[in-house]
Structure formats: structure tokens, C-alpha cells
């Protein structure tokens, strides 16, 4: 009787082992890996809106020097507060805050659509240079569909 019990237990154990090893279910294991090296860089950015003079320039028609001073003030603030990127709106309403052969100069920059800053400078070029001097990436923000904003005054022909 004991022999029969031992034999039955041995056969059952072998069958159980065979069945357990032949399962069709996939098993997943979770492992934790130690992360070494550098951490991915954070994108700490600020949007700088130009439509309706929301952030820059503070109003249309400022002198070139006033526009530059305000831009430097914003970039210094971002640098002081550890931002590493700025997103500058350069095409607020079918116009441009940079030299363009396709779009007129922005009303929000000079107070008259189509009028270049005087004395002349390219605001986008200025922003890129000043941002990079502070270790800040500059990204452009284009509004491809806004034809006109209610604060944009008259549209040039």
C-alpha cells in the first residue's frame, strides 16, 4: 500500500512538473534597473506672446532701443529663474516680427503694419542672439491661420 502511494505520488509529481513546464501562458517579470548617467534635460520654457502686445513689446511703436531693453529684461528674468527655453511668437496675425519677403512687418512692433523698425534691426535675430548669450534656446511660435486680431488696427494693402 505504501509502495502504491509512493509510486502514485511520484507519477503525480512528474505529471505536475510536465504540465507546469508546458504552459502556454507568457509570464512577465518586472525588474527595476538602476539609472546611471545623466538625466534627460528638462524643457523649462515660457511663451512670449506678441499679439495685442501681451508680453512683448509692451506697446506698438516703441523705439528700437526700448524694444531691445524690454527683450533683454524678459530674457534676464528667464535666466534668473532657470528657464532654458523661450517660445517667441513671431507671426501674430499674417504679419512678421522678422524680415520677411512674404509677410509685412507687424503692427504690434511698429504701430503700423508693413513699417520696419527704425533704426532698422531684425527682432528675431536679436532675440536669438540674446537668448543664446544666456544659454536659453529660442523657439519660434507661428500663427499660420490668424488673419487678423481685433487689436491689430488697420490692415495694409
Predicted regions and their residues:
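C-terminal motif of bacterial Sec signal peptides marking the signal peptidase cleavage site
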Residues: 17-20
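Post-signal peptide N-terminal segment of mature Sec-exported envelope proteins
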Residues: 26-44, 49
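Bacterial signal peptide processing site
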Residues: 22-24
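Catalytic domains of carbohydrate-active enzymes, especially glycoside hydrolases
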Residues: 69-95
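Bacterial N-terminal signal peptides that target proteins for export
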Residues: 1-10
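The substrate-binding groove and active-site-proximal loops of carbohydrate-active enzymes
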Residues: 53-65, 105-121
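Aromatic- and acidic-residue-enriched segments that line the glycan-binding/catalytic groove
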Residues: 96-111, 146-157
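Active-site-adjacent "subsite" loops/lids of carbohydrate-active enzymes
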Residues: 40-43, 49-69, 129, 133, ...
Amino acid at each position: 500500500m505504501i509502495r502504491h502511494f509512493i509510486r502514485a505520488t511520484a507519477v503525480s509529481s512528474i505529471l505536475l512538473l510536465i504540465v507546469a513546464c508546458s504552459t502556454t501562458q507568457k509570464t512577465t517579470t518586472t525588474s527595476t534597473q538602476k539609472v546611471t548617467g545623466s538625466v534627460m534635460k528638462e524643457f523649462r520654457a515660457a511663451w512670449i506672446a506678441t499679439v495685442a502686445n501681451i508680453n512683448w513689446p509692451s506697446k506698438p511703436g516703441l523705439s528700437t532701443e526700448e524694444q531691445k531693453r524690454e527683450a533683454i529684461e524678459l530674457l534676464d528674468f528667464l535666466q534668473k529663474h532657470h528657464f532654458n527655453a523661450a517660445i517667441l511668437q513671431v507671426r501674430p496675425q499674417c504679419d512678421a516680427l522678422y524680415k520677411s519677403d512674404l509677410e509685412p512687418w507687424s503692427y504690434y512692433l511698429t504701430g503700423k503694419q508693413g513699417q520696419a523698425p527704425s533704426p532698422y534691426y531684425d527682432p528675431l535675430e536679436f532675440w536669438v542672439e540674446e537668448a543664446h548669450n544666456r544659454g536659453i534656446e529660442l523657439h519660434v511660435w507661428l500663427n499660420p491661420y490668424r488673419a487678423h486680431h481685433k487689436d491689430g488696427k488697420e490692415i495694409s494693402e
